[in-house]
């Protein structure tokens, strides 16, 4: 069972606005135990068991750059962008967080980036003070924190390589493959579909490209038969081998 399915099953429908409320600890404990079949989701579930659910509307701010870093968040559903606004108005998106990802890790007292809901998001908000206080005596939690931190570091390293050395086609190809790996669905014809919750501008700001270059590259890949674009939010990966060559 995925983290999204496990957590959503325990949260009643709520209005699309930012708020949080506590959930009885026994229900969170049951939720955390219920995902043993999916070991990849286990670290996020261990951390989520200590938090409270929160819902953020599309394009709302979860926390701002330089705010006091009180919480770590686990994504249950939706997509979150981690971004930085430069002094001249340019924006760099550092990461897109999907269900099962955690964000808000800081070594200092304040957040160095902003976090915003790309779509309506269901999150679990966990106090940093609670995590650090319990990690010293809870080996499972300590291992979960290590695993989630390492996953974030790995994504950051891959993003650095993408920005520093790859061409526009390679960047877009790598981006689509990463989304397919993390959230894609494959049909009976073995075609993987990726849903783009983010806008073309979001993608451009993540890949360090212009929106025009992103659009041209997607069109080129479609003309080559590598992908299909049934709509602006749907991408079908028809030739993953070709994309993998771009990603190598």
Swiss-Prot record:
Keywords: DNA-binding, Nitrogen fixation, Transcription, Transcription regulation
SUPFAM superfamilies per the UniProt record, alphabetical: cAMP-binding domain-like, Winged helix' DNA-binding domain
Reported induction: Oxygen is involved in the regulation of fixK expression. FixLJ strongly controls the transcription of fixK.
One GO location term (cellular component): cytosol
Residue stretches making up the HTH crp-type domain: 166-241
Entry-linked InterPro entries: cNMP-bd_dom, cNMP-bd_dom_sf, Env_Response_Regulators, HTH_CRP, RmlC-like_jellyroll, Tscrpt_reg_HTH_Crp-type_CS, WH-like_DNA-bd_sf, WH_DNA-bd_sf
Gene Ontology molecular function: DNA binding; DNA-binding transcription factor activity
Gene Ontology biological process: nitrogen fixation
Residue ranges of DNA binding: 200-219
Task performed by this protein: FixK is a protein that regulates nitrogen fixation genes both positively and negatively. FixK is a positive regulator of NifA expression. FixK may bind DNA at the FNR consensus binding site.
PANTHER family reported for this sequence: CRP FAMILY TRANSCRIPTIONAL REGULATORY PROTEIN (PTHR24567), FUMARATE AND NITRATE REDUCTION REGULATORY PROTEIN (PTHR24567:SF75)
Record protein name field: Nitrogen fixation regulation protein FixK
Organism per entry: Azorhizobium caulinodans (strain ATCC 43989 / DSM 5975 / JCM 20966 / LMG 6465 / NBRC 14845 / NCIMB 13405 / ORS 571)
């Amino acid at each position: 069972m995925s983290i999204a399915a496990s957590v959503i099953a325990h949260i009643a429908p709520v209005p699309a606005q930012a708020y949080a409320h506590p959930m009885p600890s026994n229900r969170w404990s049951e939720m955390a135990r219920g995902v043993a079949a999916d070991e990849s989701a286990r670290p996020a579930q261990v951390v989520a068991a200590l938090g409270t659910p929160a819902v953020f509307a599309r394009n709302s701010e979860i926390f701002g750059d330089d705010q006091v870093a009180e919480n770590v968040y686990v994504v249950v559903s939706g997509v979150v962008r981690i971004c930085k606004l430069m002094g001249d108005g340019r924006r760099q998106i550092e990461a897109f967080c999907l269900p099962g990802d955690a964000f808000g890790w800081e070594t200092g007292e304040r957040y160095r980036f902003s976090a915003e809901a790309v779509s309506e998001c269901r999150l679990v908000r966990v106090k940093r003070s609670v995590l650090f206080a319990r990690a010293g005596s809870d080996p499972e939690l300590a291992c979960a924190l290590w695993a989630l931190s390492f996953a974030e570091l790995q994504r950051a390293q891959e993003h650095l390589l993408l920005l520093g050395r790859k061409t526009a086609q390679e960047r877009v190809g790598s981006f689509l493959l990463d989304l397919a790996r993390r959230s894609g669905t494959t049909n009976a014809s073995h075609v993987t579909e990726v849903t783009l919750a983010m806008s073309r501008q979001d993608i451009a700001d993540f890949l360090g490209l212009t929106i025009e270059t992103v659009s041209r590259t997607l069109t080129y890949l479609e003309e080559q038969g590598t992908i299909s674009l049934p709509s602006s939010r749907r991408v079908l990966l028809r030739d993953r081998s070709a994309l993998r060559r771009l990603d190598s």
